[in-house]
Amino acid sequence: MPADGIYSLPFEQQIGQFFFIGLPGTDFDEETRALIEEIKPGGVIVFGRNVESPDQLRALLDAARAISPINPLFGIDQEGGLVDRLREIFTPMPSARAIREHGDLAGVRTLGRVTGELLRRLGFNMNFAPVMSIMTEQRDLLSNGLYSRSYGRTPGEVLGYTTVYMRGLQGTGCLGCLKHFPGIGAGEVDSHMEMPVVRLTHDDLLAQDLAPYIELFQRQDDRVRAVMVSHGGFPNIDIRTGTTGGLLEPASISQGIVTRLLREELNFQHLVVTDDLEMGAIAKRYTIEDATVRAFEAGEDMLLICATPDAMRRGYDSLLRAARDGRITEERIHASLSRIAEAKALAQPPLPLDMERYQQLSDEILALNKKLNYTYGGSTNAAGMAGSAPVQSE
């Protein structure tokens, strides 16, 4: 069914379009089939736990696509470096920091282009990259997990590299997604564990971490059509009143950040997705039911629930109840469906899994790594495929 068929889906399936879910494992087994048939998700995200071989991965995504009423968005965090979900089946990709320290704009263009084509050949149509965080020398000392994932120390540096990366990636027909809005480089902890608190003022945020977003939003030729919102807390610009002392909410479930800042002030009217709602920054404060409804009410279009099938089902059931009860209005539902349909219309169908071309792409990354003098733990074999590199945590 074409993307605009989203409006003719049964109500329960329309609600499913708001979910981006993870899959249990490498096989399209009965558990996986049941999960997709129950939720009918608008998106599927892949992690290292789902990856065994190129043929296996493509078959997994093709099977999910075949039973979906509308083609899902198939996404992955394929940044390179620390966050490289495909390193067990493809040459490990260099980190953003390695490219930036080498001053290699041609290299980041190659990384974006190769990543985009590789993903389409494996069955994907979306990449949750690039990371837009600014990591100054002072921020490098923080334990937020972003040290090697950033493209720069200044807004201009981040803008330069991410612009070229996006052109390379999206030029292949694979959608990119800027993350983690509105910028958590100044946060002191990792969102997987706790809520990072960023104490910048509104004006400082606009001048620093938001500056690359603002510039890219205004460049029509670069077609930024998706943003991921972080779980960071921003006490100097977003405190929800009505409780004693105010309540600091994660950005992903904050109307102040998603609607007032991103939608209204910065006028971004395209797809907005949450970071994983099972991360510690959310899970230690909210039930999955509460987080799901709050995120949608805040203005998010798609809700990532990545790890636990039970949490995915509970999140879906809670949003369906909220919609049936009138807590979520028909107008609000239609607005998000429209933005999801736009993204799906832009997403291109998969390319053939041509193993000769796959090897050529692998060789391009191998050459880039050599130019950068970049290695990631383990080794690469003569064919350039990944060796015994460790698998990152999900």
What are these regions (language model features)?
Residues 10, 44, 77, 119, ...:
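Divalent metal-coordination and catalytic microenvironments
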Residues 134-145:
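Short, conserved phosphate-binding/catalytic loop or strand-edge motifs used
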Residues 1-39, 254-255, 264-265, 283-394:
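Preference for extracellular/luminal or secreted protein segments
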Residues 65-91, 108-136, 158-162, 166-182:
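Glycine-rich, aromatic-flanked loop segments that form ligand/cofactor-binding clefts
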Residues 90-104, 148-152:
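A charged helix-plus-loop insertion that forms the helical arch/lid used to bind
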Residues 19, 41-50, 100-101, 149-151, ...:
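Short, basic, glycine/proline-bearing loop/turn elements
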Residues 34-47, 114, 118-126:
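Catalytic domains of carbohydrate-active enzymes, especially glycoside hydrolases
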Residues 22, 28, 49-67, 72, ...:
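Second-shell residues forming the walls of enzyme active-site clefts
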